[in-house]
Amino acid sequence: MRVAVINGAPMAGKDTFVQCCQLLLGSVRVWNVSTVDFVKEVAKYCGWNGIKDPASRRFLSQLKDSLTEWDDIPFKKVAQVVSNFQRECSRLEQLGVGDGIIFIHCREPKEIQRLKETFNAVTVLVRREVVEKYEQSNGADSGVFDYEYDVTIDNNGDIPELHAKACSFLSELGLE
């Protein structure tokens, strides 16, 4: 089982990159989770409409900070998902399906490092020049480049190019 912490500016193509990996390995072997998944559930319970505009991005960032400060909830929720994925990978290997990878979306440099150390993860930055020029609405989004990533994926081309980069990335990790 491999773990990748993935980051990039909003709309850089992080989910599209993960989808390319899913096309190559199958969705059973590639999972996608974010440190804000549970935060979004709480926000929806509080009336958030699910639209990520600048105001809601700021709200989600602040809510995540509060839940982290209170009891490290976002990290604990991600750890549960990683544990579930680990069990699923063990089951799949017994069936001869092959190993898998879980992508954890995370913005904050300190949390990226913690995830890397806790799960022996590779860190991935997805870059797309056209979206990097926009001003960010919160500290988490504006700190994307405040970390030294293991791998940088340049997403300035088309989908077939990104697909080829996903193929190379998975191959380098020994996942085929």
Tell me what each language-model feature is.
Residues V82-G139:
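ATP-dependent NMP and nucleoside kinases share a basic, alpha-helical "lid"
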Residues K14:
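Conserved lysine of the Walker
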